Amino acid sequence: WQSTRKITWNWQSLGDLQPYMLNFLENHDEQRFASDFFGKDAGNVFAALYASLYFNRASFMIYSGQEVGERGMYQEGFSGKDGRSTIFDWYTSDKVRKLWRYIHGDMKALDRKDVALLERYRSALTQATGNRAVISGSTYDLCYCNLSSDGFCVDRHFAFLRDCGDDTVLVACNFSNVDAEMEL
């Protein structure tokens, strides 16, 4: 992982363009989060998901199968076993086929781990689309004022507020692989 300081740098460099950008964690050019080449486990995605989904008003994209932990570890078409999922080789992964069956009533198509991941994605998206602060609120990066706060690691933690009138949401993202308690 890179330092979470780059998140602050990124939004500051985008300035007024930020609401017009597309936020995403995966696409056909990038290695899948759950692949052996990147995050190795789809369950490690949530700090990145919450930061990408809740930080600003830009649109957010979930790429095919991401919500059930598609790993992209197939050697299909013109692509090697590279942790990516091609869109050009008319290929559908097992996870995407199982997700389709699950959505269409085959409740045994996905295993429990995939269902839990799907439900967590669903919950995050439902919260984001149902909260006025997330939909249209202002964003306040809290990292600069927590550089010396107890438990806050400036290279592994990212915290921000979304605020709109009486609705305020505090989001604290832990990008490390150990649990953390932080004072903000």
Locate the predicted segments by residue.
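Loop/helix patches that line or flank the sugar-binding groove of alpha-linked glycan CAZymes
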Residues: 6, 15-27, 32-183
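Helix N-cap / beta->alpha transition motif
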Residues: 1, 183-184
